[in-house]
Structures are given as structure tokens and as C-alpha cells.
Amino acid sequence: MLGMLGAGAAGVAAAPWLQRGWEGFLGAASQADPTGLTGVLPNPGGFRYYSVVGSVPRKDARTYRLKVNGLVDRPRTYTLDELRALPQKRVVRDVQCTDGWRVADTPFEGVPLSVLLDAAGVRPEGKALHFTCFDGVYRESLTLDQARRPDMLVALKMQDKPVSHEHGGPVRLYAAPMYFYKSAKWLSEITVTDEVIPGYWEEYGYDLDGWLDGEDRRGDAQAA
């Protein structure tokens, strides 16, 4: 019995290490797989890995930058440390993809989009946000009202850890009330525009808003 307990304890202790190893393998495999088929492989954390390109450069605190520009009075470029120093918000929701998989009660933490917009000073003609990613291909969009909801984050943490490269780190978008394709990975630029510019998947027929069923779709502070 003691032997069995010891083996069980060892298994529990090794579980995080095994999960990190499997996640690292899947992340590396997905970058070498232009088909995206590695996204169907199971992962203990519940997430699947997918990228629309074969390889994504890695960024860290030394090399990462986030630009906020467009129809604003005060364009700015943030370092990772500067983002960490801003007010943070924690949001816990189910993450859901359009192909049916779901990860329940997933915590994200980061800077509310509204904080960055207020700091930039959006001009009256600004109506939407266009998000660009440093994979060089992916992009997304939100209306300005959607972006000001308190459950829209520039996420620095996911599942209580810094967002890993495989999950779109060091910084990604988290659009809590929407399907996960709206939560762009590897975020590098936020541009305020005068109209909504369709994102990557919207050009293939996905819904422009991507609301989850049952979500309050108001674009105001009471929506979350």
C-alpha cells in the first residue's frame, strides 16, 4: 500500500513536468506543421494548438513591443514591463472554439483594453480596433464599444501563468464573450480605425462579431 501511495505521489509531482513537456512538443510540432493538423492532438491542459503559419518568432521581455496607434491623439509603443505595470484585471470564463471544444473556468489576467484606449485618447472618428499579430498573418477586429467592455483584455497571464509562446504569448488578446478565434495570439499592434476591418477568419466566412451563445452583447460597462 505504501508503495502504491508513493507511486501515486510521484505521479502527481511529475504531472506538471509531463504536461509542460507535452505542451512544448505540441507547440514545436505545430510550428513545423503548415497543415495545422497538430491542433487535433490532445493536451492535458485542455487546449489545442493552432497557427495559420508554419513558424512564429519568439518574443520576450527584451524584444516584445505593443504598438497602439491609428485614430488616437497619443500613439504609443509599450514594452512588456510597461504593460505589467498598468492596472490588471482577472477574468474567469469558459473558453470555447467553433469546432466544439471547450475549456471550463479558464482564468486570464491582463490590461483591460479600455485602459490602453483611454491612455491613447481615441479621436471622435474612431469606431473600431484592428489587431495585428507578429506571426505576420493573423489579424482580428472589434468595434470600439465591444473593446471597451470590461471583459476584453490584453492578456499577460493564462491559467495563472505568463502566457506561453505556444498559447500566443507573451501577449495575446482575450475577448471573453466571444468564440476563441477572436482572441488573437501573438499580439503586436492595436490600430484604431473608422470602420471594422474583417479579421483572418471573417474573410473565410466566420461571423464578424463571434458572440458566444447566451452572452450579453451590450458594449458597455454593465455587460460584464
Name every feature range the model reports, one short phrase each.
Residues 1-20:
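N-terminal export signals
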Residues 16-224:
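Structured, non-membrane catalytic/scaffold regions adjacent to prosthetic-group chemistry
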